[in-house]
């Protein structure tokens, strides 16, 4: 059964889709058999194999709340080779990565342990609580991450030099959280068989993952509405550039109804991406678009120059230096061989998992992520997977982009309308409809795990639709007012969280695990640095060959 987007109702399904849920007759799904199959307790158990992981970025700041000028602490290991503690763009921008796990509780628990361990190694520095930085100076004051003398390390550094050259370094100090998600291998044969899908299982898997991604691009605006937590920022972040933001207090600007300035045009965006023909309509179109973008020269970037003698300013003057520069709310991922480009790994082996990139850091929580976020994400992603997902046209992509922009800049505005098939409809109605559509999938997950955690999370989060004051973005605005500025609020949260994390004990086993991993990474870094290296120019050419 083909299905429309939100805002239109289907005729009653003639089959018994999911015998416990008559509401599924209104779902926009492709095959009733899929839902019936996975509603049975025995089949629902396969969903306990869903694999999850978090990546959390956060700035190190000094005791005055300024961007830390110190190098990455040696006590945190090699930022190039440590599996869980690394850096993103800036030397002061930490990134904590949880190993993938099918235990739903593991990512949050492990992320908490990373924070506890790291907070103890920072001395008088703090982990900045918010997504938006504060009190940052000119680009020259923002040091990019330094990874060592090897060609691998230099490649990462030049890439970051290029990002700063193209977009400015201030934008690279914004922090967020990514959610990595995949279905177990045992899930796919069952789904393929009840869908009469392709004989090649990887082709079927790729097609369904890309269908999930397209639906997430349609409905992902619900994430910043429910969880956005960056409605205000320090005036210093704009570095004198004009904006439509209003003054909330001296030194603090905000959008009165904003949910996530991090996801707005002020945040991390790649406007050159508008020139790229990168489509999510199939794996082939997606990888073909990426390949074209890393080989298409851009006059603006060419004018910046790639090299000054031996100094590399960027990896290339193409639309993208590497595939990682492509910005999207969700990306298909595949762990390839060492040195293998992401697009080639996807082409050769197919989609392994998806990376959802829309979570702001919740400044009220010491690890920046609330427990209900993964429960909601599981349910939304499962619904996006099962739901019919036609190709996205350029017109619809414009709608999707506009809806996201409206939600991140004024999502709590009373009466806000979003676009559905060129018609405006109330955000609240569309959000309630999405929650209706997700309810059976929450029940499916609850059947798998034997409790009501998913239904309870959806019920609680649904209240934020009619009561926007319950959203983190609204609560941040109120907290900023109480503290007098965004800086005062974020600094208070940063100090409080760091002190709390330092006071919480790690088990001897966990402490030993981290200590061993630190030493292993430093030893591996020393070995890499000692190896002879060839020409960096040849190294870069080999990567793109």
Segments predicted by a language model, with ranges:
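Terminal catalytic/cofactor-binding subdomain
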Residues: 26-164, 171-177, 204-214, 218
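Loop-rich catalytic cores of soluble enzymes, especially ATP-dependent carboxylate-amine ligases
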Residues: 40, 154-165, 173, 182-347, ...
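Histidine-centered divalent-metal-coordination microenvironment in nucleic-acid enzymes
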Residues: 57, 171-184, 353-360
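A glycine-rich phosphate-binding loop feature that marks nucleotide/adenosyl-phosphate handling sites
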Residues: 133-135, 233-237, 396-407, 454-464
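Substrate-recognition/cap regions that form aromatic- and gly/pro-loop-enriched pockets
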Residues: 347-348, 354-442, 446
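Extended, compositionally biased alpha-helical segments that mediate assembly or anchoring
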Residues: 452-545
